Amino acid sequence: MKRIAVLTSGGDAPGMNAAIRAVVRQAISEGMEVFGIYDGYAGMVAGEIHPLDAASVGDIISRGGTFLHSARYPEFAQLEGQLKGIEQLKKHGIEGVVVIGGDGSYHGAMRLTEHGFPAIGLPGTIDNDIVGTDFTIGFDTAVTTAMDAIDKIRDTSSSHRRTFVIEVMGRNAGDIALWAGIATGADEIIIPEADFKMEDIVASIKAGYECGKKHNIIVLAEGVMSAAEFGQKLKEAGDTSDLRVTELGHIQRGGSPTARDRVLASRMGAHAVKLLKEGIGGVAVGIRNEKMVENPILGTAEEGALFSLTAEGKIVVNNPHKADIELSSLNKSLS
C-alpha cells in the first residue's frame, strides 16, 4: 500500500489532531503518501482530498478540535453516497483510509470495508462509548475539563450553601459523569447505567445539610435527562434546598488535549498506519491494559448499552475490555 488518507467525522474530540499528525508522520516514515480528507465523509464524496506532509501537521499536537474539520453526513449510510466516496478515493489513487470518530463514523468505515476498501477506525469521541477499547481519544481531556468546572462550581456552592445539578456530556454513556463525579467528590452521580430514586436523593441532600455540609453537588449524565428537568423533579419530590442547575455543554469538547490523550492518539494513529502497511483493513484500533489491540470493525460499530447493573450494585460491562466498576456507594456522599 503506497497511498492512504485520513479523515475525522462526527463530533470533534481533543486529541484528533494528534492522531492525524501520527498518521501522517508514520506514513511518511513507511514510505507512503498520505492525503487529508476535509469535512469527513461529506468531503470524501465532494472530492475534498488533499496531500499532507510533515509541515502540514507540524504544529497541531497541542490543538483541540480537528484541522481537517468534521461534519455529519447521513447520506453516506446510503449506497449511492458510499459509491461516490469510493469513486473519489480511486480517482486520487487512495488505497486505504484511517477514520477517526465515534460509532457513526465507524459505520461509514464498515461500509467502505464491505465494498472491499481497507479502512481502519480510531475511537475519537469524548463519550468513551466505543466497544473494544478501554479509553477513547478525547475522553481524558473531557473529564479533566468537567472536573475543573465542577471544582469551581463547588467553591460558589459552598459560599451560598447551595445544591447544584451539573449536567455533563456523554450521550447515552455515563463515563464522563462517573469519572468526573468521583474525581470531584460529588455527592450524587446520576448515570444512565444505574437506577435511582428521587426520594432517596432528596433524603440524602437533606441529611447532608443537617450534618453541617455547605454544599451538595450532583453530577448528571445528559443521557438521563436535562439538568433543568432533573432539578424540577427534585423539587416535585420534596427538595427544599437552594437549587441551581448548570449545563457544561460544548466546553467539554474543546481545549488543548491532556498528555494522556496526546499519547493515546499518537500511539493509535501510528498503529493504524502499520496495519494498513500490512494490508490489514476492516478493524478498529483500541487500547486494552495499555496495549494496542484490533477488533473487527463490524462488531465495534454496533451500538448498545456498554453497562448493565446487577442487584448487588455492580456494573457489568457489556464491553469486555472495560473494567468492572463498583457503584454500591455512588448514590451516597463521596465527599
Curated annotation (Swiss-Prot):
Q: Which residues bind substrate?
A: T125, I126, D127, R162, M169, G170, R171, E222, R244, H250, I251, Q252, R253
Primary enzyme class: transferase
Q: Name one GO cellular component term.
A: 6-phosphofructokinase complex
List this protein's GO terms for biological process: canonical glycolysis; fructose 1,6-bisphosphate metabolic process; fructose 6-phosphate metabolic process
Question: What are the positions of the active site?
Answer: D127 (proton acceptor)
UniProt-listed Pfam families = PFK
Subcellular location, record wording: Cytoplasm
Reactions performed catalytically: beta-D-fructose 6-phosphate + ATP = beta-D-fructose 1,6-bisphosphate + ADP + H(+)
Amino-acid positions noted as binding Mg(2+) in the UniProt annotation, renumbered to this chain: D103
**Where does this chain mainly localize?**
cytoplasm
Which PROSITE patterns does the annotation name? PHOSPHOFRUCTOKINASE (PS00433)
What's known about how it's activated or inhibited?
Allosterically activated by ADP and other diphosphonucleosides, and allosterically inhibited by phosphoenolpyruvate.
Annotated positions binding ATP:
G11, R72, Y73, G102, D103, G104, S105
- Tell me the cofactors it needs: Mg(2+)
Question: Could you tell me which HAMAP family the record lists for this protein?
Answer: Phosphofructokinase_I_B1 (MF_00339)
Task: Quote the PANTHER family the UniProt record gives.
Answer: ATP-DEPENDENT 6-PHOSPHOFRUCTOKINASE, PHOSPHOFRUCTOKINASE
Family membership, please give it.
Belongs to the phosphofructokinase type A (PFKA) family. ATP-dependent PFK group I subfamily. Prokaryotic clade 'B1' sub-subfamily.
Could you tell me what this protein is called? ATP-dependent 6-phosphofructokinase
Lineage here is:
Bacteria, Bacillati, Bacillota, Bacilli, Lactobacillales
Its encoding gene is what?
Answer: pfkA
